[in-house]
Amino acid sequence: MPFLELDTNLPANRVPAGLEKRLCAAAASILGKPADRVNVTVRPGLAMALSGSTEPCAQLSISSIGVVGTAEDNRSHSAHFFEFLTKELALGQDRILIRFFPLESWQIGKIGTVMTFL
């Protein structure tokens, strides 16, 4: 069950319509998870600085069980997400940062229990 949070200082009118759905589909493909398990939040218009600059930028946080736990996996994931984000947001790679957070099944609650028991 991946969780993706895309924060950007781009104003909402510069974020392509439907980005959350395309990011959901891309994440499902990149991470090898069913799209109906992917959760995406897009937050435009934030006060942000990346590398000391307030020029347009974005930060993607990816949390998931089992697929973001190794440097090798994340190197591959990073390449694919950078390709997606540079196209969608028209930002250079130096203006995007990705953070990976491995989760355990007991850290996600769903339908009154945690994923461990589902």
UniProtKB/Swiss-Prot annotation:
Per the record, the GO terms for biological process are: melanin biosynthetic process; negative regulation of macrophage chemotaxis; positive regulation of ERK1 and ERK2 cascade; positive regulation of inflammatory response; positive regulation of tumor necrosis factor production
The source's domain of life comes to Eukaryota
Instruction: Tell me which UniProt keywords the record has, alphabetically.
Output: Acetylation, Cytoplasm, Lyase, Melanin biosynthesis
Question: N6-acetyllysine: which positions carry it?
Answer: K33
* Claim: Membrane is one of the keywords in the record: no
Enzyme Commission identifier(s): 4.1.1.84
Task: Give an example GO molecular function.
Answer: dopachrome isomerase activity
Q: In which tissues is it expressed?
A: Highly expressed in the liver and at lower levels in the heart, lung and pancreas.
- What task does this protein carry out? Tautomerization of D-dopachrome with decarboxylation to give 5,6-dihydroxyindole (DHI).
Q: What is this protein called?
A: D-dopachrome decarboxylase
Q: Which organism is it from?
A: Homo sapiens
Taxonomic lineage from the root: Eukaryota, Metazoa, Chordata, Craniata, Vertebrata
